[in-house]
């Protein structure tokens, strides 16, 4: 995946890596796949990156890992709850019952 490639190239890790060496290597893989009629894919870190990779010509784009998807969904849910419930205004005596 992208992080394995980044580690091999000795460049910073991260999804949608824009380091010039990483971009060049990803493009090289994509072009080799097209040349030999082999579907190419790349692991993506966001829906926006999936769209970008489709436009680039990739045919297989898994979106995040299961853990990352769960974390992203959880964080969005908690943000919505916190915005609507104003938890700083909640009072508690510390007892469950």
Language-model-detected regions and their locations in the chain:
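Expand to "…catalyze enediolate/carbanion chemistry for C-C bond making/breaking, isomerization
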Residues: 2-97
């Amino acid at each position: 995946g992208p992080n394995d490639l980044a580690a091999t190239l000795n460049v910073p890790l991260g999804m949608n890596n824009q380091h010039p060496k990483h971009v060049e290597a990803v493009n090289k893989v994509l072009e080799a796949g097209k040349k030999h009629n082999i579907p190419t894919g790349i692991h993506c870190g966001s829906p926006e990156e999936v769209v970008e990779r489709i436009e680039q010509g990739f045919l297989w784009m898994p979106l995040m890992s299961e853990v990352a998807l769960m974390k992203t969904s959880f964080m969005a849910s908690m943000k919505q709850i916190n915005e609507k419930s104003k938890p700083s205004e909640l009072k508690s005596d510390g007892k469950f019952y």
